[in-house]
Swiss-Prot record:
This is Leucine-rich repeat-containing protein 42. Gene3D superfamilies: Ribonuclease Inhibitor. Pfam families: LRR_6. The modification Phosphoserine is found at residues 406-407. The keyword Protein biosynthesis does not apply. LRR repeats lie at residues 149-170, 174-195, 202-222, 234-255, 259-280. The keyword Ribosomal protein does not apply. Keywords: Leucine-rich repeat, Phosphoprotein, Repeat. Residues 379-412 are annotated as: Disordered. Belongs to the LRRC42 family. SUPFAM superfamilies: RNI-like (SSF52047).
């Protein structure tokens, strides 16, 4: 009987009878329930009870889908049919290199035309905004192409960009124009020390208006030029206006800029202005201008080069980071109820610069052009002896005056260096 209960494929033998206590019982009726339960197998589960299946046939990875379609150009015909053509091998290789531009060893000797296309492709893929990799990629281009990447940089009132992207800004080389007006740098800022490096010796126009500079900052900026004849030796335009901590002693450090043609020291802490005017004219030939010079209207300095859009992108990112959140309706209603005015979201200006420009005289200097040495040709050959004598005396007197004037700066060639100057020079 146990064999029958355990076997499932056993043939039915028919009714089975059993006698018990003098009574005959049929065993098949009692085993019908057991047999039915044995003949029904338990359902088999292929997956566990909490398992679920999701079809992902149309949900591919974005990078994989881009790799599949990036090699083709899709266009439409006149009939409206979709037509695709393969991209050139140059564009495919250019895209691959731009995706891995931070792994390039060097670009020195690479053609400029191809490098500009590579820079644009990397910029379109936003490779220069990636932390770490963007700085390495930018340094590869600046080391090889210098002023082509950026020849002029305007960061006027962009102190947030300077604080966030200082290393990227320091990577630019061979700049000719640099505008750092209204950035509140101070004497100890790292960027002010970077101005004296050889990488920025090509700067000819430097705007440092309203940067909290003092005589110590001017001394630090001019030390390499005064002693080692390097640094900002090619400077032709300098704007130091609206720095009240610069005094008469600080102006004396500027005499080392022999190529300086335009200087603005309006709004500084000068006491003896008449003496300063005389020294500037005698030492470097700068004359005080009675009218405002157009060189200091900040319209000529603009960001120019391959990386001009990158600088604009930095400005947008920093502006969005400090943008105030939108006030909720209950808060706005409460402000209206209590009569509070919302803050105006206007760009910050230079209040110090405006006050100095309105209150004090503009001290802008320029270098006069040398007069033409070739005078008009005399028509008459007969010249009186008196006129010839006068003409001979004049160049002789002029030569004597020139010798006297040249002897004065020759005596001033030997500059006494302070201990702070030697400490600064030893740091290079």
């Amino acid at each position: 009987m146990s064999y029958y209960l355990s076997s499932e494929n056993h043939l039915d033998p028919g009714p089975i009878y059993m006698r018990e206590n003098g009574q005959l019982h049929m065993v098949n009726l009692a085993l019908d329930g057991v047999r039915s339960s044995l003949q029904k197998p338990r359902p088999f589960r292929l997956f566990p009870k909490g398992f679920s299946v999701e079809l992902c046939m149309n949900r591919e990875d974005d990078t994989a889908r881009k790799e599949k379609t990036d090699h083709f150009i899709f266009t439409y015909t006149r009939e409206g049919n979709l037509r695709y053509s393969a991209k050139s091998l140059f564009s495919l290789v250019l895209g691959f290199i731009s995706d891995n531009v931070d792994h390039i060893d060097s670009l020195i000797g690479f053609p400029e035309q191809i490098a500009e296309k590579l820079f644009s492709a990397a910029e379109a893929r936003q490779k220069f905004t990636e932390p770490g990799a963007g700085l390495r990629a930018l340094q590869k281009f600046t080391e090889a192409y210098g002023s082509l990447v950026l020849c002029s940089l305007c960061l006027r009132n962009r102190y947030l960009v300077i604080s966030e992207k200082l290393e990227e800004i320091k990577s630019f080389r061979e700049l000719t124009c640099l505008d750092l007006s209204c950035c509140k740098l101070g004497d100890e800022h790292e960027l002010l020390e970077h101005l004296t490096n050889e990488a920025l010796s090509s700067v000819t126009q430097l705007h440092l208006k309203d940067n909290c500079l003092s005589d110590a900052g001017v001394r630090k900026m001019t030390a390499p030029v005064r002693v080692m004849k390097r640094g900002l030796e090619n400077l032709t335009l300098l704007d130091l206006s609206c720095n009240p901590e610069i005094t008469d002693a600080g102006i004396g450090y500027l005499f080392s800029f022999r190529k300086l043609n335009c200087l603005d020291i309006s709004g500084t802490g000068l006491k003896d202005i008449k003496t300063v005017k005389h020294k500037l004219q005698t030492h470097i030939g700068l004359v005080h201008s009675k009218v405002p010079l157009k060189e200091f209207d900040h319209s000529n300095c603009k960001t120019e080069g391959w990386a001009d859009q990158i600088v604009l992108q930095w400005e947008r990112v920093t502006a969005e980071a400090v943008k105030p959140r939108e006030t909720s309706e209950p808060r706005a209603a409460a402000q209206r109820f209590y009569g509070k005015r919302s803050r105006a979201e206007a760009p910050l200006k230079c209040p110090l610069a405006d006050t100095h420009m309105n209150s004090s005289e503009k001290l802008q200097f320029y270098k006069e052009k040398a007069p033409d040495c070739h005078g008009p040709v005399l028509k008459h050959e007969a010249i009186s002896s008196q006129e010839s004598k006068k003409s001979k005396k004049r160049p002789f007197e002029e030569s004597e005056t020139e010798q006297n004037n040249s002897s004065q700066p020759s005596k001033q060639k030997y500059v006494c260096l302070a201990v702070e100057d030697w400490d600064l020079l030893n740091s290079y």
